[in-house]
A protein has these predicted regions:
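Alpha-helical membrane-protein topology signature
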Residues: 1-192
């Protein structure tokens, strides 16, 4: 229930807070594979949290995210696999959102349940592109974090909602800092 606080809510918020700290760390890393590795750990923790909160559409997206990142890290993703993962995430996410509508959470099955689907869809497209850069991933991660933050707000996982919004800001700052560092390096190369 929105804005209810119980022992269960406290436990869920603590565990999700740990996962979000991992995602914040990932947003500050400059190596693509390290970003994706840290995110895999965060996704695994969130599968546990979302199982506890019965956020089935979110769980589908976490599993797709783990799969996507591992395939990207191990360089085993192909265009066919990439497209299949994107389609599976969207189709299964939408289906699960329609099928599972808990009575105690009337906003599920509505637009809120689609937030994780859209977040994962846009992020998957960016990460799986062969020419994606660290900057592009950071910006996509910012957008994804905003969508996940809204989702967690409605799940009652307030720590993750707040930290997702902080993570979005951190990724955006890192995005601009990384650009500025690239410009400085380019100027230094031109001067030499």
């Amino acid at each position: 229930m929105l804005f209810s606080i119980s022992f269960f809510d406290v436990v869920v918020n603590i565990i999700s807070g740990i996962a979000m700290i991992i995602f914040i760390i990932a947003s500050m890393i400059k190596s693509k594979n390290k970003i994706l590795s840290w995110q895999c750990i965060g996704h695994m923790i969130f599968v546990f949290v979302e199982t506890m909160t019965k956020a089935w559409s979110s769980i589908v997206q976490e599993v797709i995210g783990i799969t996507r990142n591992l395939l990207t890290i191990t360089k085993k993703n192909t265009k066919v696999i990439s497209i299949l993962l994107i389609i599976l995430g969207a189709v299964i996410g939408v289906a699960v959102n329609i099928i599972f509508k808990p009575k105690d959470a009337p906003w599920f099955g509505s637009w809120v349940g689609y937030l994780p689907v859209v977040a994962n869809l846009e992020y998957s497209i960016i990460v799986l592109r062969k020419n994606s850069t660290v900057r592009t991933i950071k910006l996509s991660f910012c957008i994804s974090s905003i969508l996940w933050g809204l989702n967690f707000l409605f799940l009652g996982v307030y720590v993750s909602a707040i930290l997702n919004f902080i993570c979005a800001i951190t990724a955006l700052i890192s995005f601009f800092k990384f650009k500025n560092n690239m410009n400085i390096e380019e100027e230094e190369v031109k001067e030499n």
